[in-house]
Structures are given as structure tokens and as C-alpha cells.
Regions:
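Two-component/phosphorelay signaling modules centered on CheY-like receiver
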Residues: 10-29, 96
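Acidic, metal-coordinating helix/loop segments flanking the phosphotransfer/catalytic sites
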Residues: 18, 30-48
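Conserved phosphotransfer cores of two-component systems
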Residues: 26, 42-44, 66-74, 85-94
């Protein structure tokens, strides 16, 4: 079972994503800010960091950079309504998928599955 760490500051979106991802069989741990995700990344293995970009205290890009330093094999997917603006700021983000809000749940699930299907085909899991 894939383990997903979700960092999303919008309460309703976070609850919705947790329920939906768990319903299709993923184990999801959710936090409402990037600073809460760091100790979890240090303590537990996760397959995917699913993070909003615009969050208080630590944005998703900084979180992804720190996650890559802590767990180099973790995959990253950004979910945001501000993808174009946030990623044009000239900051280096780890290789990641970007899913722009609003999105349909099936699109999110398909992207997660595609990320790990590619790895399975290349023998990385």
C-alpha cells in the first residue's frame, strides 16, 4: 500500500482528499502546514508527498526541497490553484507533477497511479 503524506492548509480540501485517497486504497497522513510535515518525513517512510504550494509558515516548494533532502526517493506532486504563479518565482523545486485546482478526484488518482506505474515498469519500487 502506498503511503502518502498530504500537506494542505484548506481544511475542507484536506478532509476530502484524505477520504478520497483512502477510499481507493492509499494510506494517507495529513497535516495542515509544511512545518508539521517535516518531523513526519524524518520519522516515517512515505512514497509520495502531495502538497499545496501556497501554505502558511512553509510553502510547498520549500517543503518539497526539504523532503527530497530527508527522503531522496520520495515522489512529489503539487496541488495548487496558483501553479503558474508559484512556480515562475524562479525557485528550484524538485522534479514533481503539478495538478492545478480545481481538479476532479479521478484526475488526482490517475496521476498518482501514473507516477508509480512508471516506477514499477522501471523496477524502482
Amino acid at each position: 500500500m502506498l503511503r502518502i503524506l498530504l500537506a494542505e492548509d484548506d481544511d475542507s480540501m484536506r478532509v476530502y482528499l484524505v477520504r478520497a485517497l483512502e477510499r481507493v486504497g492509499y494510506h494517507v497522513t495529513a497535516v495542515d502546514r509544511g512545518t508539521e510535515a517535516i518531523p513526519l518525513l524524518e520519522a516515517e517512510p512515505f512514497d509520495l508527498l502531495l502538497t499545496d504550494i501556497v501554505m502558511p509558515e512553509m510553502d510547498g516548494i520549500e517543503l518539497a526541497q526539504k523532503a527530497a533532502a530527508i527522503a531522496p526517493d520520495i515522489r512529489v506532486m503539487f496541488i495548487t490553484g496558483f501553479a503558474a504563479v508559484a512556480l515562475k518565482a524562479g525557485r528550484k523545486a524538485p522534479e514533481a507533477k503539478v495538478l492545478s485546482k480545481p481538479f476532479h478526484l479521478r484526475d488526482l488518482v490517475a496521476e498518482v497511479e501514473r507516477m508509480f506505474l512508471t516506477e514499477d515498469q522501471h523496477g524502482r519500487l
